[in-house]
Amino acid sequence: MIASCLYYLLLPAARLFRFLSDAFFTCRKNALLAKSSSPQVEGNFAMAPRGPDQEECEGLLQQWREEGWNQTLSTASEGPLADKGLAESSLALLMDNSGEQDTASEDKWSSRQLSDLRAADNLDQPFPEVLGEEPLAEDEGPLWAAVPVQTGPQYADCAVLPMGAMAAEQWEEDPAMVAWSIAPEPMPQEETSMWPFEGLEQLQPPPMEIPYHEILWREWEDFSTQPDAQGLEAGDGPQFQFTLMSYNILAQDLMQQSSELYLHCHPDILNWNYRFANLMQEFQHWDPDILCLQEVQEDHYWEQLEPSLRMMGFTCFYKRRTGCKTDGCAVCYKPTRFRLLCASPVEYFRPGLELLNRDNVGLVLLLQPLVPEGLGQVSVAPLCVANTHVLYNPRRGDVKLAQMAILLAEVDKVARLSDGSHCPIILCGDLNSVPDSPLYNFIRDGELQYNGMPAWKVSGQEDFSHQLYQRKLQAPLWPSSLGITDCCQYVTSCHPKRSERLKYGRDFLLRFRFCDLACQRPVGLVLMEGVTDTKPDRPAGWAECIFEEEISELEPVFPRTIGTIQHCLHLTSVYTHFLPQHGRPEVTTMPLGLGMTVDYIFFSAESCENENRSDHRLDRDGTLKLLGRLSLLSEEILWAANGLPNPFYSSDHLCLLASFGMEVTAP
C-alpha cells in the first residue's frame, strides 16, 4: 500500500523535477549566450578586454542569430559537409573564449577571402574549401601586376581584419599604393631598396625582368629637315656634319669622398671596372667625333681611358685640376675629321685673389674640319670647342661668374678671326647652374646686371633666402689686375699691340728731374762729401705731379661698367630643358634624389629681333647649324630606375649628345 502510494507520488515528482531541471539548464544556456559579450564572466568563460576584434565578432554573432539559423537550416539537406558546418557553427556559439570566437568569425568568410586573410596574418593552417567553389588559378604573369581595388558587396564587412585591427587604426593605406600590389610569388624575394625622398611612395621599383634600356630609352631628335625659328629651311649646299658629346663621368675619388650620396646604389655598380666598361660601351655606341669629359680622374685617364680612346681613333688632351685635386677635364677628337690648330688649358686659380682661389679648370681647342677630297677646293671655318667644370658651391655665385669670365675671355681670344669676328664656338660642360638662372641667362643673353644680387641666386641650385647673412655681389666683380674687362675680353685684345721696347725722348725724361721720387734720398746710399751730400732744390713753380698723364698713357686703362658684365659670343643652348611629351623638365643629374639640369652644350647662333616681344632675343642658325640631339629624361623616369648611377648609366650625370653641320664654302 505504501509502496503504491510512493510510486504514484514520487514518479510525478521525479518527472516534475526532471522537467524543472531541463528548464533550468535551458535558461542557464540562454543566459550564457546573452552574456557571452560581457567581460565579467568568471572561470573558463572569462574574456579579454573589448577591442575592435571583439566588437566585429559581436556584430557577426548578432547577424548570425538573426539570419544564420534560417540560412543554415535551408542548406541542411545539401550533404554531410553542410551538416558538419552546422554542427561546428552551433558549437562555436557555446564558446566564449576569444581565440575560439576568432575561429568562429573566420567561418563566415569564403575560402578565397580566408586565404587572403591568412596570407595577411601570416597563418599557415589551411581552411577547408567550400563545396562547389572552383580552385584558384595560379598567376603566371609578371612579378609586378596591377590589381584593381576590390569594392564589391562581399567585402562590405571586411573593413577590419581579425588579427590586424590595431595596425589598421594606426596607419591608413595610400589609395595609390592599394591600386598596386605584388602578384603571388612562388618563392619569397628580397625587397628592393628605394630612396627615402618625397613622392617615391607613388612609384614601384622596376621589374628585374625588364631591361633598364626599356625604362631609360632616349630618343634621337632630328632637326635636319625642320625649319629654324624664322621659318627658313636649311641650306641645300654641302655641309660638314659632326657629333659632339659632353659627359661628366664621375671621378672615382670624388664618389668615394661623398659616398653618402650613393647609398641607394648596389656596391657592384659603383666598382670602377664595371663603370669603366659601361662608359666605354656608351662611347662606342654613340661614336661622337668630339668628346668632352669632366671629372676625369688622372690615373684612370692615363692608364685606361686615354689608351682605350686612342684605340678608338681619338686624340686626347687632358688638364688636371690645380692643387691636390686628382680629376680634371679632357677633350678628345678624331684626327680623321679635325686637325688641331691650337690648345689652351685654362686655370681659374689666381694666387692672391680670394675670388679666384678654387682649383677648377677648363680646356679650349681650335679645330680645323677636314673636308673630304671629293668636294674639291672648298673650305670650312675653324671650330672652337671649350670644355669646363665650374665650381659646385651653391653659395659662391661670385666665384662662378669670375670663372666663366676667364673662360669666355680665353674663348674670345682663341676664336677671334683677323677681321675681328669669331669662328663657330661650342661651349659645353658641367656649369653647376640650373636653366634660367642668372649665370645661364648671362651665357645665353650676353649680359648680366649683378650689383646687389645674392651670391646664392647666381646658380639657382638652392634657395638660401631664409638665411640671415647673405653674401651679395658688389661692383666691380673682379679687380682690374685680372686683366679682363667687363666684356669678358683680355685687356691685351682690346688695345693695339705696342712695341716691347719703349723709346723715350730727352725732353720727356727731364720732366722727371725734380719729381718727388727723384728728390728723396735712397735708403742705404753712402754719404760722400761733395758727391752724395747735396740735397736737390726744386725750382720755383715746378709741378710736383706733372707726369700723371704720361703714366696713364703707358698703362692701358679700360672702362669699368657699374654692376654689369657682357660678352659678344652669341651663344644658345642645344636643349630646351623641357620635355613636352611628358610635361616635365629635363634632368641631367639627380643629387640627393632631386633632378635638375646642370650640364649644357652652347653653340654659336645669329641673334635676331623679335617683332612681337622686343625684349626677348631669338636665335637662328648661322654658320653652325644644329641638326639633332639625344633627348634627355625626366626626374620620374630616373626615379623608376632607382636614380643615378644605375646598372645602365654608370655616372651620376647623363651624357649630352648633339649633331651639327657647318657650311662648306668655295675659296
From Swiss-Prot:
GO terms for cellular component: cis-Golgi network; cytosol; endoplasmic reticulum; mitochondrial outer membrane; nucleus; perinuclear region of cytoplasm. Disulfide bonds: none annotated. The modification Phosphoserine is found at residues 77, 105. InterPro entries: CCR4/nocturin_mRNA_transcr, Endo/exonu/phosph_ase_sf, Endo/exonuclease/phosphatase. The keyword Ribonucleoprotein does not apply. Keywords: Phosphoprotein. GO terms for molecular function: catalytic activity; eukaryotic initiation factor 4E binding; mRNA 3'-UTR binding; protein domain specific binding. Gene3D superfamilies: Endonuclease/exonuclease/phosphatase (3.60.10.10). Belongs to the CCR4/nocturin family. This is Protein angel homolog 1. It comes from Rattus norvegicus (Rat).
